Structures are given as structure tokens and as C-alpha cells.
Amino acid sequence: MGVQPGVGLLDPGLGDDRVLLAAAPEDLRSDAGDVVVEMGSEDAPGDLEGGQEELAGRIAGLLDAHTLTVVLGGGHETAYASATGLVRSGRVAAGTRVGILNLDAHFDLREAPRPSSGTPFLQALRDAEGAEHQLSYAVVGISEANNTRALFDTARERGVTWVTDEQAQTADVTGVRRWVRSFINAVDVLYLTIDLDVLPAAVAPGV
């Protein structure tokens, strides 16, 4: 599962098992199975929406079973399904303040005719319009060079808050932690998502 249609790198497909091994001992985790969330190409269209719908259903079910749920693999084409599954679950009721905290170099608020790894959080924010729950979105690690002016404009219009990569590097760590804690304290339910491109190339070459 790669992110080429979102103008990203193809997933080598080897990371999931290694992350699982590093995350927790085998007796403390359970594999809920694989879901293909595939954008495809012009020559071989994938069923991105179908995969997202299946993944959202699985996530909602796991959360309703009070299971800490982690989605691994691919790019942020899985993020819309994750947000959708969360708000469909019993964890979110009328008036619930949902927060999405994204560690990422990109906003992923792209306006596009088709969903991709670059569109999920704009989709989620639009879904929240008129919904009974509230949704806030914050990003740590934004690269000013890798987000267009239009994306910054969209972020401002949507009430998104962010810390740039340079701010995160030059600020006191305590200050960044305080900023994150302030966001977390203002929501009832938190969805944390991490895109590895938030890491410097020297730390994560090839991302």
C-alpha cells in the first residue's frame, strides 16, 4: 500500500511487522487483520473509498470493544478511515470534543476531485460541519517549504493550529509540550497520527 497518487513515496511494505515487534511483546498485542486501502492508478483504479469504509468499520468495532487501536502502514489515505471510525464509535456522542493531533510535515488538507493521502483531514473537517460532535485539528512539524499558500489559507479558514518544524526545533521542548498539552486538555477524545516525514532525513533516511 503506497502513497504515489498523493505525490509521495511508495511503501516498501516491510515496516509493519518490525514496528509491531518493537511496539509491544507479542502477548500484549493482537493483530486485527489487514485492510487494503488502495488508491490505484489511472490504468488500474483502486477502491480507495471501499477500503476506507471497511477500515472505518473495523476501527469503530475495536473502539466499541474498548481496545486501544493502532493502524499501521501506507500513508495518510488511512487517516480519513481512522477519523471516520472514531466518530462512528460509541466513544463519540453528541457534544463530544474530538481532537486530531497530527505529527507531520504536511497539512493534508488538499482540495482535490478524488480523495488521496493528501485530503483526509479536510474530509474529516467537512464531515464535522453540522455534526453533533466537535472536531479540532492540530499539526506539529509543518514544513513551510512543502505546503502551498492555499494550504495555509485552508488551515486558517478551518481553525487549524500548528507548530512548524523550525519552531519545534528552535523552541524549548517544554514549550512544545505545553502547546500539545493545551490542545489535548481541550478535547474529550484524541486521535493521534504520525507521518514519518515529520522526522529529519538524517534520522529517517528514505522517508
Can you describe what each PLM-predicted range is?
Residues 2, 6-207:
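Conserved alpha-helical scaffold segments that buttress catalytic/binding sites
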